[in-house]
Every structure is written in structure tokens, then in C-alpha cells.
Amino acid sequence: MKWKALFTAAILQAQLPITEAQSFGLLDPKLCYLLDGILFIYGVILTALFLRVKFSRSADAPAYQQGQNQLYNELNLGRREEYDVLDKRRGRDPEMGGKPRRKNPQEGLYNELQKDKMAEAYSEIGMKGERRRGKGHDGLYQGLSTATKDTYDALHMQALPPR
């Protein structure tokens, strides 16, 4: 009995819809235009507020004075460079424990190549002599284990027929 009632209710719901979207007026074009207008005004207001905050920050930045008691101060390089030498006036090297740095007049930022010395060492690349061990094809297949080498030696390579 329950199955008959359930089956009848399912068929009635499929054939006779209870509500439609038209009954609420959601497909009315006037309502869509109204909602589009509201979203457009909302977007314009948000864009105006964002631009006001963005451009007012750059004008307010000099108003903040950096003091000694402030927790976070902006980096002020002043007359220092990005890679400045520490303790420049005394010429001490912090990597050597503060000992004075020896200045070598020949030591520059870049050393030039000395072609005459380089030419002697690399003027000619010598060739190593060929090593021949065992049969003639050992040079092709190096590093074979003894079992694999025996199998290789037992097989004879045949020449390919000409094309």
C-alpha cells in the first residue's frame, strides 16, 4: 500500500509542478535591470574608495617622522651604498677579525687574462694511447662482467649486408 501511494505522489509531482519561476517574477527584465544598476553603483563606490585610500597613503607618507623611539623605521640609506664596506675609515676587514686589510696594488676588481701563460698550458691537447687487451672488440664493450664477456666472446658479429 505504501508503494502505491509513493508511486502516485511521484507521478503527480512530475506531471503537475507546484511552483514555477514565473510566479515569483524572477525572470522579469525590469528586475534584472534594477539589480544590474545596483551592482554598477556598488562597483563605482568601491573603486572610488580604493583609489582614495591608495592615493592618500602616498601623500600621508612624509607626515610620519622617523624617530629613535619608533619600533619600525623605514630603511634610510642616506649616503651609504647598498654594498658599502664596514668600518671604512680604519680599513679593517671584519672577516679577518678586525685586522687591518693589506692592500695589494695589483689586486683589482677584475684581473685580466694572461694569455701568454694560458697559451702554453692549453696549446695542444695530447691524445692518450689506445689500450688493447684481449680480442679486437674489447674496446667497444668495456665493463662487462666475466660471464657476460664470455657470452660476448662466443658470439661472432656478422657484417651487415650492403643495401
Swiss-Prot record:
Its post-translational modification remark reads: Phosphorylated on Tyr residues after T-cell receptor triggering by LCK in association with CD4/CD8.
Which residues fall in a compositionally biased region of kind Basic and acidic residues? 83-98
Q: How does it assemble?
A: The TCR-CD3 complex is composed of a CD3D/CD3E and a CD3G/CD3E heterodimers that preferentially associate with TCRalpha and TCRbeta, respectively, to form TCRalpha/CD3E/CD3G and TCRbeta/CD3G/CD3E trimers. In turn, the hexamer interacts with CD3Z homodimer to form the TCR-CD3 complex. Alternatively, TCRalpha and TCRbeta can be replaced by TCRgamma and TCRdelta. Interacts with SLA. Interacts with TRAT1. Interacts with DOCK2. Interacts with SLA2. Interacts with SHB. Interacts with ZAP70. Interacts (tyrosine phosphorylated) with SHC1 (via SH2 domain). Interacts with PTPRC.
Q: Residue ranges of region Disordered?
A: 83-111
State the protein's name: T-cell surface glycoprotein CD3 zeta chain
Locations listed in the record:
Cell membrane
Indicate the family of this protein.
Belongs to the CD3Z/FCER1G family.
Phosphotyrosine is found on: 64, 72, 83, 110, 122, 141, 152
Q: How does it sit in the membrane?
A: Single-pass type I membrane protein
| Intervals, Cytoplasmic compartment | 52-163
Of the GO CC terms on this record, one is:
Fc-gamma receptor III complex
Question: Which residues are the signal sequence here?
Answer: 1-21
Q: Which residues lie on this side of the membrane: Extracellular?
A: 22-30
Q: Where is the ITAM domain?
A: 61-89, 99-127, 130-158
Q: What does this protein do?
A: Part of the TCR-CD3 complex present on T-lymphocyte cell surface that plays an essential role in adaptive immune response. When antigen presenting cells (APCs) activate T-cell receptor (TCR), TCR-mediated signals are transmitted across the cell membrane by the CD3 chains CD3D, CD3E, CD3G and CD3Z. All CD3 chains contain immunoreceptor tyrosine-based activation motifs (ITAMs) in their cytoplasmic domain. Upon TCR engagement, these motifs become phosphorylated by Src family protein tyrosine kinases LCK and FYN, resulting in the activation of downstream signaling pathways.
- What keywords appear on the UniProt entry? Adaptive immunity, Cell membrane, Disulfide bond, Immunity, Membrane, Phosphoprotein, Receptor, Repeat, Signal, Transmembrane, Transmembrane helix
> Could you tell me one molecular function GO term of this UniProt entry?
protein homodimerization activity
Asked whether the keyword Cell membrane is assigned, the reply is yes
Domain note for this entry? Answer: The ITAM domains mediate interaction with SHB.
Q: Which residues get modified to Phosphoserine?
A: 58
UniProt GO BP: adaptive immune response; T cell receptor signaling pathway
Q: Which PROSITE patterns match?
A: ITAM_1
Task: From the record, give the transmembrane residue ranges.
Answer: 31-51
The answer to whether the entry has keyword Cell wall biogenesis/degradation is no
